[in-house]
Every structure is written in C-alpha cells, then in structure tokens.
Amino acid sequence: MHVTVSEILERFQPEGLITNHIGPDSVITRVAPIEDCAPGDLVFIDKPKYVGDVLQRKPAAVLTTPAIAAEFGESPALAVLIAPNVRLAIALIKQAYADRDVRDTEWPRIHPSAVIHASVEVPADAIIGPGVVIGADVVLGRGVVLMANVVIERGARIGAETVLHPGVTVCIDCEIGAGCILKPGCVIGSEGFGFAQDAQRRNYRIPHTGKVIIEDRVVIGANTTIDRATYGATVVRSGTIIDALVHLGHNVEIGEDCILCAHTGLSGSTRFGKRVIATGQTGTIDHITVADDSVLLHRAGLNTSIKQPGMYAGGPAQPLQQYLKNMAVMPRLHEIWSRLKKLEKAVAQLGSAE
C-alpha cells in the first residue's frame, strides 16, 4: 500500500464518502488499529476518547467524524480525513488499497492440474487454481477466481468477478451472481433434508430437483451449507452477508442485504424479508416468514412468523423488552418458587383452621 491522503480524497469525495481533508498530504503505507499504529499508518477514530492515543503514536493520518476532527485543530500535525460514516469509509478504503489481491497467485493462470470439461468457455482473465474441477456446460463470467480444489458441477453458472476460495463446491445447475465471495469449504446446492416414511417408519430419500440461486454481491462464510430446493429454488438475494457455519435448508429465501451470523440454522421454506439481522445461533422451524428490518437476538428460536419489524430474542422468540424482563426474573426463580410454596402452605393451614 502506497497512497497519499489527497489521492484518497480525490477517489472518495465525489460520492460523499469523505467530505474534507485538513493537515499535510501524508503518504500512507498501512491501515492499522489505534493500539498498533505508527508513522505511515492510517487509523480511524469514531470515539473522542481515542484522540490522545493517536496524537501520542503519531500516525500519518486519521479518519474520523466532523465533530472529532475539530479536536485536532485547524492545522494539525497529522492529516485528518473527515467522513460522515467512518466505519463505511474505512471499509471501502481498505477494499481499495489494503485488501488481499486474489488475482496475485504463484501458479499459472490456469493450473495444469485443473480438470475442465471441453464444453466450458474459460474467460481470458479467469484464474483457475490447482485441483479445480469444472463440469460440463458450466458458465464462467469474466474475471472469476477459482482457488485450489474448487468443484463446480454440471450446468452451474458463476457470475463476473466472483471469487471462490479453496474447497468450495457449487453443485449441479446452481447459480452464483456477480461480485460474490464464497469462503473456504462452503457447499452450495447439496441435496436438502427431505425424506418420506412408510408404515414401519423406514426412511426414503426424496430427490431434490431444484437448485440454489445466489444473487449479486453476496458473501458466504467458511463451511456454510445452502441446500438445493426440493422443487424450484433456494434463494439468497443481493447484498446479503452470511457468516461461517450457517445452514440454510431447502427452499429458504433470504431477502436483500440481510446479515446471518455464525451457527444460524433456518429450516426449509423459511422466508426472511429485506435487511433482517440474525445473530449467532438463531434458529427457525419450517415455513415461517420474518418481516423486513427485524433483528433476531440471543439465540432467537422462532416457532411462528414475525409480521412486524422489531427486535426479538430468546426461544420461543419474543419482543426484546419482554425478553429482558423475563431474563431479569430468571435468577430469582428458585427463590420465588420457594416463597410460593410457603404461601400455599400457609393458605392451606388457614383453611384447615376454619
């Protein structure tokens, strides 16, 4: 990384991500945390309490809010970049200047160990790593990166500029949109969990003849599994971020710009609206819906649909304020139970005395 403060401003000011710059036009060689910053670094501050630490460590530049920027004075010794949304600004700056270059590989552009079916047209700018297997009639968009041991089965489609990290499997006929990132070991389109039983309760597999559709700009974490539909499609819509170790059952539909944290498990045909946030270990029964802009907290367990946006927690899931009141009582349950038993006994004795 080697970029000046003025270059960052020039790149991001037109879209309003960074609004101003005061101080010197410093050269930045690294984006660093406050506790580890040094000369040449860019740090970000979203709380005034960190200003003193930054001044003491003397990085090249700081990215902060208009209010905090005022604490550095009109002619600061270090460069100050001003952004209305500091967290968003640092994310996009790191993407532009400090992200891993997945196209910079030590292998040939197409590794000789890759197995590619003759029907596949490989774009001139695609990167295909060691041990990759690509089945018949697969469609690859421009600029795709397929790292070591990726498997793409027959008829699947991978959109432009999508990156598949090592060990990703995209199963038959599944579709991945443009600009997606699939992290190591995730499996898209394995058969869903569907069985029929006879009178003796013997199990019979139900073939899943649907597929998975992942729309554009979706990020899927390591070892996440998304099952193909029994019929039709399991769908993850654009802009959604999925953490590691998440499981989506057959025919689940996730709306745009959702966030699913680790260990979330959604049963078949669950429907999430737009911008739903599911924190760690959220779970649902099948065939329920969750309204746009809902937030699911504290191992939320949903056994019924959520029709109104809001914050919900616990299992069975309940409105957050109700959940917090109930949790406050939990440590006193034994005491309350003991007092109730004594009260019942006293009432019974009063009745006998009459």
From Swiss-Prot:
Biological processes per GO annotation: lipid A biosynthetic process
UniProt entry tagged with the keyword Transferase: yes
Keywords linked to the UniProt accession: Acyltransferase, Lipid A biosynthesis, Lipid biosynthesis, Lipid metabolism, Repeat, Transferase
InterPro entries: Hexapep, Hexapep_transf_CS, LpxD, Trimer_LpxA-like_sf, UDP_GlcNAc_AcTrfase_non-rep
Reactions catalysed, as given in the entry: a UDP-3-O-[(3R)-3-hydroxyacyl]-alpha-D-glucosamine + a (3R)-hydroxyacyl-[ACP] = a UDP-2-N,3-O-bis[(3R)-3-hydroxyacyl]-alpha-D-glucosamine + holo-[ACP] + H(+)
Entry coiled-coil feature ranges: none
EC number: 2.3.1.191
GO cellular component, one term: membrane
Transmembrane segments: none
GO molecular function, one term: N-acyltransferase activity
Pathway assignment: Bacterial outer membrane biogenesis; LPS lipid A biosynthesis
Record CDD domains: LbH_LpxD (cd03352)
Annotated catalytic residues: 250 (proton acceptor)
Any Pfam family hit: LpxD
Superkingdom of source: Bacteria
SUPFAM superfamilies: Trimeric LpxA-like enzymes (SSF51161)
NCBIfam families: lipid_A_lpxD (TIGR01853), PRK00892.1 (NF002060)
PANTHER family assigned: UDP-3-O-ACYLGLUCOSAMINE N-ACYLTRANSFERASE, UDP-3-O-ACYLGLUCOSAMINE N-ACYLTRANSFERASE 1, MITOCHONDRIAL-RELATED
Role: Catalyzes the N-acylation of UDP-3-O-acylglucosamine using 3-hydroxyacyl-ACP as the acyl donor. Is involved in the biosynthesis of lipid A, a phosphorylated glycolipid that anchors the lipopolysaccharide to the outer membrane of the cell.
Sequence similarity: Belongs to the transferase hexapeptide repeat family. LpxD subfamily.
Subunit-structure text: Homotrimer.
Protein name per UniProt: UDP-3-O-acylglucosamine N-acyltransferase
Gene: lpxD
